Amino acid sequence: MTSAADRVPAPLLVLAGIVSVQFGGALAATLVPVIGAGGSVVLRLLFASALLLVFVRPRWRGHSRRAWLTVIAFGVALGLMNFTFYSSLAHLPIGVAVTIEFIGPLSLAAALSRRWLDAVAVAAAAAGVVLISEALSTPFADLEKTGIALALLAGAFWAAYIVLAGRTGGEFPKLEGLALA
């Protein structure tokens, strides 16, 4: 049985993914003051899950215990990444929060680097993130430590999300793992 996602050209899926992530993030950020970070994340993930379940129609049976543990960990990392990031926004300017959050995936990239050129690319990415953010114009003493801790946690969950996304992709065909997460 083919899913709706199987019949859509890949570039269109990528474009739809980009639009949905950006729109969902913007909408969720505007909801944070009204329903809190937790409520915003729950609504965002429930909506995304419903769409994925409809369009991907994943198989629920026939997966190993290891596959289920992987997809559950992936979903938890995704939820906690979003929750800690949105929570950090109550304490930090968005540019600073994003800059701190990027420490997670950049640290992962640095840890997985095998060549000096990889390390140069990680350093260039880190410099670029800092330069386009508000991080350099915001004195460290003015930053709330709670916000810093939450943004660092969001970065750690982002790194875990990256690792678990790869493992989930190895355990489930196509988008099934993401839909089940």
Task: Indicate where each model-derived feature is located.
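Membrane-interface interhelical linkers
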Residues: 1-17, 49-73, 114-120, 139-143, ...
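Hydrophobic transmembrane alpha-helices of multi-pass small-molecule transport proteins
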Residues: 73, 103, 117-136
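Specific alpha-helical transmembrane segments that line the substrate/conduction pathway
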Residues: 39-50, 78, 86-116, 154
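Glycine-/small-residue-enriched transmembrane alpha-helix faces in small-molecule transporters
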Residues: 1-39, 76, 80-84, 127, ...
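Helix-helix packing/entry segments at the starts of transmembrane helices
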Residues: 43, 97-100, 164-181
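Transmembrane alpha-helices of multi-pass small-molecule transport proteins
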Residues: 10, 14, 32-80, 107-108, ...
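Hydrophobic core positions of alpha-helical segments in small-molecule transporters
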Residues: 16, 43, 74, 100, ...
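A helix-boundary/kink motif common to multi-pass secondary transporters
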Residues: 36-37, 93, 173-174
